[in-house]
Amino acid sequence: MNEPRGPDLSSVIFLMGFRQSGTTILSSVLGSIDGFTDLGEVHNVWGQRGRGWPKCGCQLRVNDCPFWGDIVGDPVTEDLQPSLAGQRGADPHDVERLRTDWVQQWRRSRLAVGSRTRSEKEIADRYVSLMELVYKRAAAKNGSVLIDSSKDPAYAAALDRIPGIRSHLIHVVRDPRAAFWSRVRKSHGGSGDDSALLATRFAGSWLRTNFLAELAMRKHQSGRTTRVRYEDFMANPAGVLLDISTMVGVDPGPLPLKGDTTAILRPNHTASGNARVRFKSGPVELKSDDEWRRELDPTGRRIVTVLTAPLLIRYGYPIAI
């Protein structure tokens, strides 16, 4: 469980969770601790290339970034020839289909629905080879603990298959009613357009993601897993950061906090993620957004509450508000 970290054993923290659950701010604050590096949502480095290289947290395009440039640049082609050769050819720049195949295959295997068009082993070997290269090249940059906030439990499952990686899974949860309001506000400009259908679909997606995250934690080979509530992190960031550092086995030294709830974010090289957070540096106040308690439409609130009640209770959230 707590094997010593040898020279070839890299540590990666993977943050799982539903959208609008706070994974980006948690990874940003963690990445501001000495010895930790926030990579952002690593899976999107490749998937976004068809629409042009995304902008790194340092404000340069990923392919021009001094951190990412030689990780995802042309030299990757030779390294990935063996693992990507076959049906998809040997073009490592078009890996979105591979990534999608892996996610769909893993979900089907866990939910026991649908038929498999390609073997799980074939898909896993190809995707794992790609991510192994990315993680190990990133670790070679500075040897620190890497943080991947890609959210989807399927990517966490792939991480668990990479040799030479000491992986840690963190399941980040947030009150689904708060997450739903964040989604409504973002999508509809705060108009309150949270119809019954939208609330029902949201609740179903929230339940599925968190159910799969729990499965990923149970299947994780090392048992190095924990759950963090967004609200607890906002209320006591120091306690959460220390707990995570203890799990990883790293002395964090001085925490990037000023006072109880102000984080001091340092410039980062996040490849993807919430732009409102990852492009920030300097002091950022950490506070839980309770606007949903006043603004969320009662119908949407009731639907989300009823449908997510089992996990609301499991995660310690009140049913009645």
Where would I find each of the regions flagged by the language model?
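A glycine- and Lys/Arg-enriched "phosphate-lid" helix/loop adjacent to the NTP-binding pocket
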Residues: 170-171, 179-207
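Phosphate-binding beta-loop-alpha motif at adenosine-nucleotide cofactor sites
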Residues: 143-147, 167, 218-247, 291-295
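Short beta-strand segments
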Residues: 15-17, 40, 146-148, 171, ...
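Conserved phosphate-donor/acceptor-positioning beta-strand/loop module used by diverse small-molecule
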Residues: 148-151, 159-184
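Conserved, well-structured beta-alpha core segment at the onset of a catalytic domain
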Residues: 1-55, 208, 212-213
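PAPS-dependent sulfation machinery
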Residues: 42-146, 285
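PAPS-dependent sulfotransferases, especially Golgi type II membrane carbohydrate sulfotransferases
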Residues: 1-14, 19, 84, 106-116, ...
